[in-house]
């Protein structure tokens, strides 16, 4: 997702250090200090404009959520949306998802969400896919024992690749849905911006849950 730069984005981020972190290394192993309560931490890698992570935090106050995004304007939009309400169990991290071990201690995270990630369809770009084995190794390191990954996409090719990649890594599947919105799993589903857009066009949404 490429969004035109917003001139107000840097200023908004700088104005709210209580809600967004730009130097994640400073909080490695101490993320719960940024929340009102010490609770299991769930992260979303590639949080976009924040619809998913904001609504998840509101729906599940018993968990702490961190939305991670590498594009400054995009995360500024997410921050702006989040500031419209008081959501004490939500934080944002402006950072590269490929460097999670720099920002989180081993076992500091309880769950990783990957939603509508860039499919990087060309073979030479395989290593950039967020379900490539090097990313899985990173998730395994920062997650608690038997930590869980949830992945949603509209891209059948990426989903098939991800099933193959997670299986080869030795992960255990808890569930696989080839048409999420026409399944019982959809009862508790929280949509992303992309998900709402694609499902409205009749595009099936794919989902998996797996743990290490």
Curated annotation (Swiss-Prot):
Membrane-spanning intervals of the chain: none
InterPro entries tied to this protein: SAM-dependent_MTases_sf, tRNA_(Gua-N-7)_MeTrfase_Trmb, tRNA_methyltr_TrmB_bact
Gene it is expressed from: trmB
GO cellular component, one term: tRNA methyltransferase complex
Catalysed reactions listed for this entry: guanosine(46) in tRNA + S-adenosyl-L-methionine = N(7)-methylguanosine(46) in tRNA + S-adenosyl-L-homocysteine
Natural source organism: Pediococcus pentosaceus (strain ATCC 25745 / CCUG 21536 / LMG 10740 / 183-1w)
Pfam families per UniProt: Methyltransf_4
Active-site residues, as the UniProt record annotates them: 118
Gene3D superfamilies given in the database record: Vaccinia Virus protein VP39
EC number: 2.1.1.33
Enzyme class: transferase
Region (Interaction with RNA): 124-129
Keyword Phosphoprotein: no
Pathway per the UniProt entry: tRNA modification; N(7)-methylguanine-tRNA biosynthesis
GO molecular function: tRNA (guanine(46)-N7)-methyltransferase activity
Keywords, sorted A to Z: Methyltransferase, S-adenosyl-L-methionine, Transferase, tRNA processing
Name of the protein in its database record: tRNA (guanine-N(7)-)-methyltransferase
Function: Catalyzes the formation of N(7)-methylguanine at position 46 (m7G46) in tRNA.
Annotated substrate binding sites: 122, 154, 192-195
Family the UniProt entry places it in: Belongs to the class I-like SAM-binding methyltransferase superfamily. TrmB family.
Ligand binding (S-adenosyl-L-methionine): 44, 69, 96, 118
Lineage top rank: taxon: Bacteria
């Amino acid at each position: 997702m490429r969004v035109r730069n917003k001139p107000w984005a840097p200023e908004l981020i700088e104005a709210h250090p209580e809600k967004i972190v730009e130097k994640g290394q400073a909080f490695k192993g101490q993320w719960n200090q940024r929340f009102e309560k010490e609770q299991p931490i769930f992260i979303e890698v590639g949080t976009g404009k924040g619809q998913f992570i904001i609504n998840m935090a509101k729906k599940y106050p018993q968990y702490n959520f961190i939305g991670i995004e590498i594009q400054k304007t995009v995360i500024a939009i997410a921050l702006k949306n989040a500031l419209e309400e008081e959501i004490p169990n939500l934080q944002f991290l402006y950072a590269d998802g490929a460097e999670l071990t720099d920002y989180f201690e081993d076992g500091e995270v309880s769950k990783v969400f990957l939603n509508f990630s860039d499919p990087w369809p060309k073979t030479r770009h395989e290593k950039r896919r967020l379900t490539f084995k090097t990313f899985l190794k990173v998730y395994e390191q920062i997650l608690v024992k038997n930590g869980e990954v949830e992945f949603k996409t509209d891209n059948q090719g990426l989903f098939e690749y991800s099933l193959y990649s997670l299986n080869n890594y030795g992960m255990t599947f808890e569930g696989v849905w080839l048409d999420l919105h026409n399944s019982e799993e959809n009862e508790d589903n929280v949509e992303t911006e992309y998900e709402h857009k694609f499902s409205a066009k009749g595009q099936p949404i794919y989902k998996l849950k797996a743990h290490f």
